[in-house]
């Protein structure tokens, strides 16, 4: 009986899981990626969120951004894993999947000289995360250092929606 139970467990463990609604993918964020990102989202309201696997506040904020993305499909949501501590793609992808951000455009810093990448985004940025940059339709950028409050994101979204009327 014990062998039968162990065999059943082994069989269940080998079966594929339920298909994910959408599998997250990571693009490599390297020199020139910031300008490429801005160019590809030009004319659309875009929320760019810098986060990291080892960032405590990011673990709380990512699911909130997933909810924001679900409620506001007119906003392009981009996440960039800019962790100071190198981490695996699998860890980042797992967090994005859990947070409901699989359908977002997801990037990961891929240059060993992260300071150069941060400088391209904002010359004054010292690497603190979480960090959110809200890019309006006309390219105007608003930076939120630390956790982005849901009310601030909603206010920005309402301004973007009003600008199209």
Regions found by a protein language model. Name each.
Residues 25-46:
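A short beta-strand-turn-helix
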Residues 60-100, 113-117:
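Structural microenvironment flanking redox-active thiols in thiol-disulfide oxidoreductases
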Residues 9-17:
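Hydrophobic h-region of N-terminal signal peptides that target proteins for export
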Residues 50-64:
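Conserved redox-active cysteine motifs that mediate thiol-disulfide chemistry
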Residues 128-165:
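Thiol-/selenol-based redox modules, centered on thioredoxin-like
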Residues 47-48, 77:
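Hydrophobic beta-strand anchors of alpha/beta hydrolase catalytic cores
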Residues 95-129:
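Short, internal strand/loop/helix patches
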Residues 1-6:
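Bacterial N-terminal signal peptides that target proteins for export
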């Amino acid at each position: 009986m014990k062998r039968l139970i162990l065999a059943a467990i082994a069989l269940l463990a080998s079966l594929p899981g339920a298909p994910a609604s959408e599998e997250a993918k990571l693009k490599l964020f390297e020199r020139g990626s910031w300008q490429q990102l801005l160019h590809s989202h030009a004319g659309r309201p875009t929320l760019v969120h810098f986060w990291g696997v080892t960032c405590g506040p990011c673990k709380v904020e990512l699911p909130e951004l997933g909810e924001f993305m679900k409620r506001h499909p007119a906003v392009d949501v981009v996440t960039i894993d800019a962790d100071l501590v190198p981490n695996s793609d699998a860890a980042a992808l797992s967090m994005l999947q859990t947070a409901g951000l699989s359908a977002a455009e997801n990037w990961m810093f891929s240059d060993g000289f992260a300071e150069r990448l941060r400088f391209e985004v904002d010359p004054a940025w010292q690497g603190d995360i979480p960090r959110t940059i809200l890019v309006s339709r006309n390219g105007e950028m608003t930076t939120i250092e630390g956790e982005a409050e849901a009310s601030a994101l909603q206010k920005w979204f309402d301004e973007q929606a009003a600008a199209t009327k």
